Amino acid sequence: RNYGEYVANGDEVRDIVGKQYQGLRRALRNTTSPDYPSFNMDISDQTRADVWLHEFRNYVEHGSLPSLEIVRLPNDHTSGATHGKPTPRAYMADNDLALGRIVEAVSHSPFWRDTAIVVVEDDAQDGPDHVDSHRSVLLMISAWNRAGVVHRFVNTTDVLATMEEILGLDSLSQFDHYGRPVRGVFAAQPDMTPYDAIKPSVDMNEKNPESPQAKQSAMLDFSRADAADDETLNRILWKTIKGDVPYPGPTRAAVGELIGE
């Protein structure tokens, strides 16, 4: 089931197909939730979570869940410091709570024992700081998780290989074919303890005030994902969140790992 990935916004398709949202790829037409919003920074991720939860409860009631779900929660992109829009902190709190509500629902359901949730960013480059900006977020959530972290280099193709191995799927390309599944996160026995979502301490209704960064943000395109200039937006976010802390500038590092047998 697809929730928001490669989906046209409602205004682009409503008059054509009579549905609010539709997958842009033919393979997604019959598997996309017509009620789940795609990228739109004026829509809360709580709204997206509400739609997902409504469908999930139906799956629980009927005792059947799709083998693979792709769920897009885009509000961690933020709208920079745009006046009147949620602050970056509020957007992130919204994003975190939506994810937490999804994990809570799965972990309290009969599907928890047989479900793994993989959390990644849509892009493997992030704002620059003291760490190479090609790094990205990866969270593996399941009843079979070992506590702690796995200390090894993981690429996006490794994540795909992990999902393919769990689902019993063939590789999509030579890249994920040679990916190394992240088996080290899983334990021999499950821990069925459910998760309860934590309400953010940040006010999710907090709005950006007028500021020099608000004027800069007004010049950026937030209508599409990643349409805003990266460097400009990163500097705006840094100033908004860090204040007078010096901007670190981009860090680039050669990434490699010696793989021994």
PLM feature spans:
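N-terminal pro-sequences and low-complexity stem/linker regions of secreted or lumenal proteins
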Residues: 1-261
